[in-house]
Amino acid sequence: MKILILLLSLLSAPAFALDPINREAHIAATLIAGRVGDTIRNTCPTISARMFVVYGKLKELERYARAKGYSEADFTAFRNDATEKNRMKAEAAAYLHGAGAVEGDVESYCRVGRDEIAKGSLIGELLRSSQ
């Protein structure tokens, strides 16, 4: 009888629906930071990625997503979705522009990268400067 009552109470409880993964602020912000770092390292010849750190941060983010209730498939699909990639690229470009990066001016990207490294921001943690 107790099991039946427990089962009925569980079945009647409302299910907690997750927000779409693209609305999870920490996940989106972290992936955008990664996109900013990637753009900087691909533009500035004196800045490179700290690949072990990048990999570690990605795994940390995957664990965070799982703890929030998202599946590995949800996370992978979000990361690989073309629409989301374009949205994140646009947000990364806007961030870079706001930070002083100017398209066609390589040194401006290097300067933003060095500033991020000096600040110790998430973007800066993903990068290393050879200067």
Regions found by a protein language model. Give the residues of each.
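Short, functional N-terminal and low-complexity linear motifs
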Residues: 3, 25-31, 45, 57-60, ...
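Compact alpha-helical subdomains of small soluble proteins
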Residues: 56-131
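N-terminal signal peptide c-region/cleavage motif recognized by signal peptidases
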Residues: 12-14
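Sec-dependent signal peptide recognition
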Residues: 1-7
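Immediate post-signal-peptide N-terminus of mature secreted/exported proteins
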Residues: 17-53
